[in-house]
Amino acid sequence: MTVRLPDSLLVLERGWLSANNILFFDGDDATLVDSGYVTHAAQTVDLVGHALRGRRLARLINTHSHSDHIGGNAALQAKFGCEIVVPAGLHASVAEWDENALLLSPLGQQAARFQHDSLIGAGDRLAMGGLEWQALAVPGHDMEALAYYNP
């Protein structure tokens, strides 16, 4: 069985042990899910900029706070002026930039500090790529992690 992704969704495959980035297109705007490592931030900005093809990166949504998912946030926000949305349980950790709570310092990881604009929680719904998605709590790998499900 072959699965075909919608044309409004583009997966930017990254290297081993790095989070893939997923772009959702909605007319002239786009949403990116996760941003990769801080050490790959310049490459991420270039890849996203090329993939946008003139669209505006309006929003960046993080699934959780590991460094391979939030590392490029600051660079993308600086370049594109996008809104950053984080899981609701990360509000204080990101706002105060608590590197222990974000699991950066304990794991010897890095991420450039960024400011988030809004929160998303389990059960919330959002539109991406012309489809409706529901945020699902998926604690385990990260206790605040969210996955997005298209019912």
Where are these regions (language model features)?
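Short beta-strand-initiation
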Residues: 17-19, 115, 121, 143-145
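Active-site HxH/HxHxD metal-binding segment of metal-dependent hydrolases
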Residues: 39-42, 49-128
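Short Pro/Gly-enriched beta-strand edge/turn motifs at strand-loop
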Residues: 3-9, 104-108, 129-133
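Structural motif
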Residues: 29-31, 59, 131
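Core dinuclear metal-dependent hydrolase active-site scaffold
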Residues: 23, 123-150
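Conserved beta-strand hairpin/beta-sheet module of binuclear metal-dependent hydrolase folds
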Residues: 1-55, 147-151
